[in-house]
């Protein structure tokens, strides 16, 4: 009897500990187990992230990216925006540190189109100009989705929760600049329009026509807009959103 009681208590304690630890473990990048783990881009080993470079071969340059955010991005594209990312792909020293950075430039009326970061929360501050920003919640119990939006000026800060669709729009007459930080070394980005209408191979017309309640001809017309390469279709790819092309950094979105 005593052993059964002990087993029951042990199981209960283990359940409580696991329930408190697992959410934190699953909700962020893996925790570092050493001072640093500089990404070894030359390794042929595939892991969740990057394997570590030999510490004896690490130099200060592995943690340094000169003038990374000092040069304005090219906003001459369909979306009128450009993203300059600083993720583990650009700065190997970020590996296992759970953070990344980006500069977003906006032409007048330019936007970072609706997109989501599946692996990160984003916090953004405006350096120049004004931005209309917002995010949309997941499906609500009673149906529908809520939108939270705000007009930001220089020095204002706004946060976009992990995984939720969000956007930024320069509704001013002058260029705008913002800086974003994200809670992952590699946040990922899904640009909604690109993913839905520009996937390879394309999603079936029947699926999209029914989902958007439009005709198949209209689906074909929209899909044709996303058939061009990212450089031609605008927005680029990238860290933040991307305009008529896909990606985490590059042309349109953190």
UniProtKB/Swiss-Prot annotation:
Record keyword Lipoprotein present: no
Domain Cupin type-1: 67-220
SUPFAM superfamilies on file: RmlC-like cupins
Top-level taxon in the UniProt lineage: Eukaryota
GO CC annotations on file: apoplast
Signal peptide: 1-27
Record InterPro entries: Cupin_1, Germin, Germin_Mn-BS, RmlC-like_jellyroll, RmlC_Cupin_sf
Primary residence: secreted
GO molecular function per UniProt: manganese ion binding
CDD domains documented for this protein: cupin_OxOx
Disulfide bond annotation, renumbered to this chain: 37-52
SUBUNIT field: Oligomer (believed to be a pentamer but probably hexamer).
Protein name as annotated: Germin-like protein 4-1
Source organism: Oryza sativa subsp. japonica (Rice)
The organism's taxonomic lineage, starting at the top: Eukaryota, Viridiplantae, Streptophyta, Embryophyta, Tracheophyta
């Amino acid at each position: 009897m005593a052993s059964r009681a002990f087993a029951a208590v042990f199981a209960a304690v283990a359940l409580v500990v696991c329930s408190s630890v697992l959410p934190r473990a699953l909700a962020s990048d893996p925790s570092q187990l050493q001072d640093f783990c500089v990404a070894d881009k030359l390794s042929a080993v595939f892991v969740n992230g990057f394997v570590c470079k030999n510490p004896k071969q690490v130099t200060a340059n592995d943690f340094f990216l000169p003038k990374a955010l000092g040069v304005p991005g090219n906003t001459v594209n369909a979306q009128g925006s450009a993203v300059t990312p600083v993720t583990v792909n650009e700065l190997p020293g970020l590996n296992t540190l759970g953070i990344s950075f980006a500069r977003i430039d906006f032409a007048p009326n330019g936007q970072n189109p609706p997109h989501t970061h599946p692996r990160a929360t984003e916090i953004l501050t405006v350096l120049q100009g004004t931005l209309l920003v917002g995010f949309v919640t997941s499906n609500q119990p009673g149906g529908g989705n809520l939108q939270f939006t705000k007009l930001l000026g220089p020095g204002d800060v706004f946060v976009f929760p992990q995984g939720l669709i969000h956007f930024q729009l320069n509704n001013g007459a002058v260029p705008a600049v913002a800086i974003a930080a994200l809670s992952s070394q590699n946040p990922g980005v899904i640009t909604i329009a690109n993913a839905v209408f520009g996937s390879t191979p394309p999603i079936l017309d029947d699926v999209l026509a029914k989902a958007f309640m439009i005709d198949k001809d209209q689906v074909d017309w929209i899909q044709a807009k996303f058939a061009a390469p990212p450089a031609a279709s605008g927005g680029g790819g990238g860290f933040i959103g991307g305009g008529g092309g896909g990606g985490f950094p590059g042309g349109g979105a953190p």
